[in-house]
Amino acid sequence: MGMFCNQCEQAAKGVGCDIIGVCGKNPEVAALQDLMLYGLKGLAIYADKARELGVKEEKIDYFVLEGLFTTVTNVDFDPVQIAGKLRTCYDYKERIKALYETAYREKNGSSAPQITAGPAAWVIAGDLEGLVKQGQEHGINTHHADADIRSAIEILIYGLKGMAAYADHAYILGKKDEEVFAFFHKAMAATADPAKGLMDFVGLAMECGKLNIKVMGMLNEGHVAHYGHPVPTKVPTGTRKNKGILVSGHDLRMLEELLKQTDGKGIDVYPHGEMLPAHGYPGLKKYAHLYGNFGGAWQDQAKEFPHFPGAIIFNTNCIQRPADSYKDRLFSWGQVGWPGVKHINGWDFSEVINKALECPELADAPAKEILTGFGHNAVLGVADKVIEGVKAGAIKHFFLIGGCDGAKPGRNYYTELAEKVPQDCVILTLACGKYRFNKLEFGDIGGIPRLLDIGQCNDAYSALQIALALADAFKCGVNDLPLSMILSWYEQKAVVILLSLLHLGIKNIKIGPSLPAFVTPNVLNFLVENFNLGPITTVDADLKAALGQ
């Protein structure tokens, strides 16, 4: 059984994974994820039509987010779990179809036109083997016969996947938006419309970037409403003597619930990877047993997790194939899944807690502290100092160096870049790419740390607010600021953040360590001509270009 997947930066040979995914995804799971996209297209076709008649159901709207999130890199590898979601997808498609047909009949006095082919007419197979066969018939290469149009469709779909992840987090925090739900349906339905051309999908991709700013803003509002604005916070990177639970992922609401349930039980809760910024939120840092930051970025988990003796839980990506040395201590939650790993449904984490209590304690092993919590509220709180520093010449340039980390060789570029940034420049960072350099010493400029950790990948929203505020203060556009964006990417959330930046007209962005395999030469030329988007080259050359030397 073969497969083809090219959605992440680690696409084999820079083309795509066709035997097994570098991420660990096998052909069976790849086929089921392809079928999920196909099924969601069918659901979206009817949901879009129903919405035009004023008919909608929130549970169906939310499922589209869940379904797309399921197909994000390093989220769900469990075929049984995905098969269950496919059945839900089919049931919801049939339900919204029936609601649409009823509304159409009531409005027009006649039956709705029947759709007899394509994803809207999909009939689900009866067993797992049948689902896999269906998925194999609807892979990436079936999106469109024209390579450039297919590339634009993929950019749109991967942007939708990234936005779905953020919208899912926001929804869990009570933030939702009708315009966002409607766009998911419109855009997914469009990907199945043979009448749509290249510029239609370019336009939809830009619209996706625009709406993602709204979604990231909703998520920011949800975080702030629940936990307050992040504040600069020192975080120890060592361990202390106590039982422990390691939390990996991005979902702060899940972390909060775990902190509540572990309070007073002699268990420390350690953030891993993108959970590090939790320490900056007053509503989370008030828990004394939220402690430390164990390990580095996601791709090092196989080396690091065997050395964490407690329970481990993933609440979003990035999960990798677990080693036997810790698989029996590993749990998944939300959209995450791996065969043989215990999945926690709902908000009762007693199984995780009991496992942690059974496990050995961590040792007292003090280590250096790192800083986090420099969201836009904190940075703009000292904006006068920043502006004064720029005007006085103490701060010559800002570098946004961040994004996803990964295992592919070449990512040491970002370490070297951060190290070589001149002493009169400030580095903004976010997402797990920060682990390439966040334990290095950078000093400060007039009391302002030279390295400012803005937060998670979704806190690109904060980075944008900082950039827009600086542009306003200096009465110029963002492109006129002494600001360079040199980003690392890995999966689909990075794609939608890039679309958001492009929607704002931000130019001269460099991305790496390699360009997406799903971008054809013609589509790349369009991005270069319109946005001067380009790949990283060498540290010295890119620094000279950024500093105008």
Curated annotation (Swiss-Prot):
It is found in: Cytoplasm. The keyword Oxidoreductase applies. Pfam families: Prismane. It catalyses: A + NH4(+) + H2O = hydroxylamine + AH2 + H(+). Signal peptide: none annotated. Its EC number is 1.7.99.1. Hybrid [4Fe-2O-2S] cluster binds at H250, E274, C318, C404, C432, C457, E491, K493. One of its GO terms (biological process) is response to hydrogen peroxide. InterPro entries: HCP/CODH, Hydroxylam_reduct, Prismane-like_a/b-sand, Prismane-like_sf, Prismane_a-bundle. Its main location: cytoplasm. CDD domains: HCP. The modification Cysteine persulfide is found at C404. [4Fe-4S] cluster binds at C5, C8, C17, C23. Its cofactor is [4Fe-4S] cluster; hybrid [4Fe-2O-2S] cluster. Keywords: 4Fe-4S, Cytoplasm, Iron, Iron-sulfur, Metal-binding, Oxidoreductase. One of its GO terms (molecular function) is metal ion binding. It is an enzyme of class 1 (oxidoreductase). GO terms for cellular component: cytoplasm. Catalyzes the reduction of hydroxylamine to form NH(3) and H(2)O. PANTHER family: HYDROXYLAMINE REDUCTASE. Belongs to the HCP family. This is Hydroxylamine reductase. It comes from Geobacter metallireducens (strain ATCC 53774 / DSM 7210 / GS-15). The gene is hcp.
